């Protein structure tokens, strides 16, 4: 092959590779924009402060749940070590680890009133986490307090049980196969992988049930796996930074553990929240929904599409889940939830059993003008200025035309009826 042709072939091949990777780079930029809009860096700092108050109560509750089951009694010490290695890495200072263990041991001797106060502090952290996750998933309205309590109780009890059960199974496997004696290197690799899997289980539980929004199970699992791997990489990078680069010991002396611990908790929350943003954005990957802009006129079209789908399902006597709606409306689940919430506020739709949605009004009773005012433009009657009056005059003919068309008429025009 002539050199010129070889050079042209190389350029073409490189261009093809760049074109193939373009969706991944574009999706990464999309996630970065979402993190910036959600102020993940600032929220991580806020959660770091809240964690300082609630870390010991959460740690104590987790140990109390584990110790309540005799089958886990032999593994309580290992459970402590595993939790502390995640929450307080060894490079953050042995002083904090010793204090954490002392706090947890002393907390087990508390009276009923003291335990209640510990629970309240832990619930405060859970409430802050829920509000943060709801903001990431675009939830405007939280759960009722009774439903909130059920979610918090599930996380505070099921999380430690999942960790304890997984740890019990893991240690049984090691004991049955004698990996630690026969293949120590493989045992170390499997133990590191087991830590990632255990962390992913808890994160998947958080990502799946804490947001007041439908989160597909596979999205929660993928997001949790990616986040747990990032946590391990962050732990390694942070250890290198503290050991080789930073000079906290030189500046702070005996108090060096405190800023190191604060910085680690901040990094921990930063990775967890970044994983939550990644999990919420996974629904935008399907159908290249991340490429579109969620502008008012697009939400107007999405609302029409949702109503048409629910009208057709109503005629069949069915209800549609968010997953079924998402197959036709190419948006993220958070954006779809926002459209459904606005329609529900006006009484057009309602969520029924199992997150399924139904149409509450006849399609012939819903005109396009009302939907236009909900999602695109509504005149502010209290303004009374010249600009508002002029806009109302210009939009008058359009409003009249939309007023004459119902969702049922639209369905006939587009061949849905």
From Swiss-Prot:
Gene Ontology CC terms: plasma membrane
Main location: membrane
Localization of this protein: Cell inner membrane
Name of one Pfam family that matches: Virul_fac_BrkB
Entry keyword Transcription regulation: no
Transmembrane segments: 52-72, 79-99, 110-130, 150-170, 185-205, 214-234, 258-278
Membrane topology label: Multi-pass membrane protein
Keywords: Cell inner membrane, Cell membrane, Membrane, Transmembrane, Transmembrane helix
Family indicated by similarity: Belongs to the UPF0761 family.
Record's protein name: UPF0761 membrane protein CV_0810
Organism: Chromobacterium violaceum (strain ATCC 12472 / DSM 30191 / JCM 1249 / CCUG 213 / NBRC 12614 / NCIMB 9131 / NCTC 9757 / MK)
């Amino acid at each position: 092959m002539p050199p010129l042709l070889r050079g042209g072939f190389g350029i073409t091949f490189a261009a093809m590779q760049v074109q193939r990777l373009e969706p991944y780079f574009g999706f990464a930029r999309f996630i970065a924009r979402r993190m910036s809009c959600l102020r993940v860096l600032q929220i991580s700092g806020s959660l770091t402060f809240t964690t300082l108050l609630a870390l010991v109560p959460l740690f104590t509750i987790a140990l109390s749940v584990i110790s309540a089951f005799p089958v886990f009694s032999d593994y309580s010490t290992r459970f402590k070590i595993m939790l502390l290695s995640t929450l307080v890495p060894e490079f953050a200072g042995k002083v904090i680890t010793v204090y954490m263990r002392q706090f947890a041991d002393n907390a087990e001797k508390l009276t009923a009133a003291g335990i209640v106060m510990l629970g309240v502090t832990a619930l405060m952290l859970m409430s802050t986490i829920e509000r943060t996750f709801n903001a990431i998933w675009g939830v405007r309205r939280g759960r009722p307090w009774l439903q909130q309590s059920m979610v918090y109780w599930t996380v505070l009890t099921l999380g430690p049980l999942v960790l304890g059960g997984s740890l019990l199974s893991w240690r049984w496997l090691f004991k049955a196969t004698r990996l630690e004696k026969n293949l120590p290197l493989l045992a170390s690799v499997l133990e590191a992988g087991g830590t990632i899997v255990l962390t992913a289980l808890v994160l998947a539980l958080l990502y799946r049930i804490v947001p007041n929004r439908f989160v597909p199970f596979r999205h929660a699992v993928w997001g949790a796996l990616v986040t747990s791997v990032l946590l391990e990489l962050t732990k390694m990078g942070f250890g290198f930074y503290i050991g080789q680069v930073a000079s906290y010991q030189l500046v702070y002396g005996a108090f060096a553990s405190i800023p190191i611990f604060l910085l680690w908790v901040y990094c921990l929350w930063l990775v967890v929240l970044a994983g939550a943003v990644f999990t919420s954005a996974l629904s935008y990957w399907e159908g290249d929904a991340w490429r579109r802009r969620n502008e008012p006129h697009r939400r107007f079209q999405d609302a029409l599409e949702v109503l048409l789908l629910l009208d057709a399902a109503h005629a069949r006597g069915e209800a549609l889940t968010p997953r079924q709606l998402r197959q036709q409306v190419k948006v993220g689940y958070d954006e779809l939830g926002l459209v459904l919430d606005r329609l529900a506020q006006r009484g057009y739709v309602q969520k029924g059993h199992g997150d399924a949605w139904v149409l509450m009004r006849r399609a012939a009773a819903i005109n396009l003008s009302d939907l236009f005012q909900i999602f695109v433009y509504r005149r502010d009657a209290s303004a009374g200025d010249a600009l508002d009056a002029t806009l109302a005059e210009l939009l008058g003919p359009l409003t009249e035309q939309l007023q004459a068309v119902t969702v049922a008429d639209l369905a006939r025009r587009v061949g849905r009826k």
